[in-house]
Amino acid sequence: MKSSYNLRSIAAKVVGQVLDQGQSLSALLPVHQREVSEKDRALLQELCFGVLRVLPQLEWCIQQLMAKPLTGKQRTLHYLIMVGIYQLHYTRIPPHAALAETVEGAVALKRPQLKGLINGVLRQFQRQQEELIQREANHSSHYLHPSWLLARIEHAYPNHWQTIVEANNQRPPMWLRVNRLHHTREAYLNLLAQEGIEAFPHTEFTDAIRLASPCAVDQLPGFSQGWATVQDASAQGCVYWLDPQDGEQILDLCAAPGGKTTHILEAAPQSHVLAVDIDETRLGRVKENLLRLQMHAEVKQGDGRYPDSWCEGRMFDRILLDAPCSATGVIRRHPDIKWLRRDRDIEELVALQKEIFDAIWPHLKVGGTMVYATCSILPQENAQQVTDFLTRHADATLVDTGTRELPGIQMLPHADGGDGFFYAKLVKN
């Protein structure tokens, strides 16, 4: 950590790295949080996530306040103005402090000559704030999504696309997965209540608990001992539908960061799990999760398209394929997805999913079960992908999961519910 720093300038740089360089916020933020004191880390996260969540609104406001946007080497100052407007409109930071710290950010970014400009734009926003926000509410920027994604969501869900978009724009709830090897869900709910933490059980997924308000993990009873894991309810549905059993050979493909790997081992502690991911760095997270929960799984780096290079001819009783996808179901947790994804990416992802799906199917034993899952809400990656797979593989049968949405189950993001997710359960004849 630097002895002195300007937090607003750091937030502006992070936003710029996401928007101009295409970097992932979840990868960037921990690196930059090390530049600030522990007490400032939550604020840095709030500013970065917040600006990316409401980006079109901030862009629209700046267009009304400035004749010409800052570009080129001054582009980071454009993002600094966004950080300032976000603070003034969305946070409880006293306006004088938000203004002063944001204006000083220009010095930290080595553009002291622009302090007056930034001060003027932010003060103008202060004066016109109510009028600007009212006008913006009637503009397409109010949906806070890129037009291509908005069009895809509206086409897929013509009757309730606005509800999905609204859920994407909200702050996500915090869900826990209770480790059934330590406590029943009811017992852990009692432990939370003793700590004054209000929580609610999920109606379908038997290990899932929603906190009334998010809290730091060190406040959770027994977190360091592995009593609970932070994992969205819909993500927990993958293992719920996989239904692993003791003694089975189980493959968790595209396993990082390991939430589903450890969930499999909680559900079937005597199973033999192979966790595979293409990203060596993210496999480190799988190992960390296994260590915290004191569990063992075989962890390998490998490309799902070429299983012969890593699975050594092994056959599996169950396979969980959490396929690479557009992540359009988890936008509320990762608002940068809206700006990192492009329309053309969807077809490329569908082709990649097909390749992995087809490549791994021969490694499922006859009578074995596969769950195909994504954290997408787009039909091309989900129901259509499974329909096409079934036409190519006569030895695949879809398991009826009791929904009318065959093939598979499509979960949509909901304010008090889980993220957007899709599951299809298949059995090999």
Swiss-Prot record:
InterPro entries according to UniProt: MeTrfase_RsmB-F_NOP2_cat (IPR049560), MeTrfase_RsmB-F_NOP2_dom (IPR001678), NusB-like_sf (IPR035926), NusB_RsmB_TIM44 (IPR006027), RCMT (IPR023267), rRNA_ssu_MeTfrase_B (IPR004573), rRNA_ssu_MeTfrase_B_ent (IPR023541), RsmB-like_ferredoxin (IPR054728)
Gene3D superfamilies xref list: Helix hairpin bin (1.10.287.730), NusB-like (1.10.940.10), Sun protein, domain 3 (3.30.70.1170), Vaccinia Virus protein VP39 (3.40.50.150)
Catalytic activity: cytidine(967) in 16S rRNA + S-adenosyl-L-methionine = 5-methylcytidine(967) in 16S rRNA + S-adenosyl-L-homocysteine + H(+)
GO BP term, example: rRNA base methylation
MF GO annotations: RNA binding; rRNA (cytosine-C5-)-methyltransferase activity
Residue positions of the active site: C375 (nucleophile)
Entry EC number(s): 2.1.1.176
Enzyme superclass (EC): transferase
UniProt keyword annotations, A-Z: Cytoplasm, Methyltransferase, RNA-binding, rRNA processing, S-adenosyl-L-methionine, Transferase
Compartment(s) of residence: Cytoplasm
A single Gene Ontology CC term: cytosol
Chain sites annotated for binding S-adenosyl-L-methionine: C254, A255, A256, P257, G258, G259, K260, D277, D303, D322
Pfam families from the UniProt entry: Methyltr_RsmB-F (PF01189), NusB (PF01029), RsmF-B_ferredox (PF22458)
Highest taxon above the source species: Bacteria
NCBIfam families registered for this protein in UniProt: PRK10901.1, PRK14902.1, rsmB
HAMAP family tied to this protein: 16SrRNA_methyltr_B
Family: Belongs to the class I-like SAM-binding methyltransferase superfamily. RsmB/NOP family.
Role this protein plays: Specifically methylates the cytosine at position 967 (m5C967) of 16S rRNA.
Protein's name according to its UniProt entry: Ribosomal RNA small subunit methyltransferase B
Phylogenetic placement of the source organism: Bacteria, Pseudomonadati, Pseudomonadota, Gammaproteobacteria, Enterobacterales
Gene for this chain: rsmB
